[in-house]
A protein has these predicted regions:
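Surface-exposed strand-loop-strand hairpins of Gram-negative outer-membrane beta-barrel proteins
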Residues: 63-76, 121-136, 223, 256-262
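Outer-membrane beta-barrel transmembrane domain signature
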Residues: 36-37, 85, 98, 161-269, ...
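Transmembrane beta-strands of outer-membrane beta-barrel proteins
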Residues: 51-57, 77, 107-111, 142, ...
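Short glycine/proline- and aromatic-enriched beta-strand/turn motifs that initiate or cap beta-hairpins
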Residues: 34-87, 108, 119-121, 283
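Transmembrane beta-strand segments that form the barrel wall of outer-membrane beta-barrel proteins
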Residues: 55-63, 88-96, 125-129, 152-162, ...
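Residues that define the transmembrane beta-barrel architecture of outer-membrane proteins
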Residues: 51, 61, 71-77, 134-140, ...
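Cleavable N-terminal export/targeting peptides
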Residues: 1-48, 267, 283-288
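Flexible, solvent-exposed coil segments and beta strand-coil junctions
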Residues: 55-60, 120-124, 148-155, 206-216, ...
Length: 288
């Protein structure tokens, strides 16, 4: 390639192409590095947590048994779980323990459960004498709630009894939710409960043996509308994680439940519950 006149024409072309390719590569390197740096800079960091869990307890002054005219004090556990970063879901006193599997801007659908306290003769020997014991009832099912406007929620729960009774229970509620201040929220609205006969019988029916032992007439309770009523609640956030609440719920027993001799002769169709509770929220990272 070398001659007295220097590089040949082919060699000069090859050298020029090599020089240009190197220059382009050198210029592209900082651009690529800058693009990678920009991508890492603007990429959202992973969330610090995955879930927010709320736990708590409340004490309730309530009828000794459903239909009772006398009262007792009982504790009640509280639990809720939601995705980290989402606002806390409003909870009314009647709401069961559950979480939303399907969510939108104004609705939730998901599983729910409740525990119904059992009944023992020793709880009220005068009213329950001869009626025997009824075990606690676990109820599992589903709920759906819908916000018509930001201050009005409707909710329905349908649950199947798996212990204590084996009937269906449906709770229907509506609540007006009014934030008075950033810390204080007031709420309240109507309530209704419908049940099948299988959910009523263990608590309000009286068979031949129970009748002979208690002196109450034989009675078979059917299903239908068990109660109607209303409730109200006040909730106050002391910190973003800690809140307390107080509530009152009133139910008027109806239908076959109100006609049960246990209610007409030894109890009352008017049922009042008053409660006070405290909750604490925790943010957690999913372990897997």
């Amino acid at each position: 390639m070398w001659g007295r006149k220097g590089l040949s024409q082919d060699s000069r072309i090859w050298a020029w192409r090599t020089l240009m390719a190197g220059s382009i590569a050198a210029a592209a390197m900082p651009v690529a590095a800058s693009a990678a740096d920009m991508e890492s800079r603007f990429k959202a960091p992973p969330a610090a947590y995955d879930w927010t869990i709320t736990v708590g307890v409340e004490g309730k002054v309530e009828p000794i048994f459903q239909g009772s005219k006398d009262f007792t004090v009982r504790p009640n556990p509280l639990f809720d779980i939601r995705r980290y970063g989402t606002p806390e879901r409003f909870r009314a006193p009647r709401d069961g323990i559950g979480f939303g599997l399907f969510e939108g801007s104004n609705f939730q659908i998901g599983p729910v459960g409740q525990i119904r306290i059992g009944r023992r003769e020793s709880d009220d020997r005068s009213a329950l004498h001869g009626l025997g014991n009824v075990p606690w009832a676990g109820e599992i099912g589903a709920f759906a709630e819908y916000w018509f406007v930001p201050w009005l929620r409707a909710r329905a729960e349908v649950r199947q009894g798996v212990t204590g009774h084996h009937g269906l229970v449906a709770d229907l509620t509506a609540d007006a939710v009014v934030p008075v201040t950033r810390q204080l929220t007031l709420s309240g609205g109507p309530r209704a409960t419908l049940v099948t006969a299988a959910a009523n019988r263990p608590y309000f029916s009286i068979d031949d043996i129970q009748s002979a032992a208690s002196g109450l007439p034989v009675y078979s309770a059917g299903g239908g509308l068990r109660s109607v009523g209303a409730g109200a609640q006040a909730r106050y956030f002391w910190t973003p994680q800690i809140a307390t609440h107080v509530f009152v719920e009133y139910d008027r027993l109806t239908g076959d439940v109100a006609d049960s001799p246990l209610v007409t002769q030894r109890g009352s169709p008017d049922q009042v519950t008053i409660g006070f509770g405290i909750t604490r929220s925790f943010d957690i990272k999913q372990p897997w």
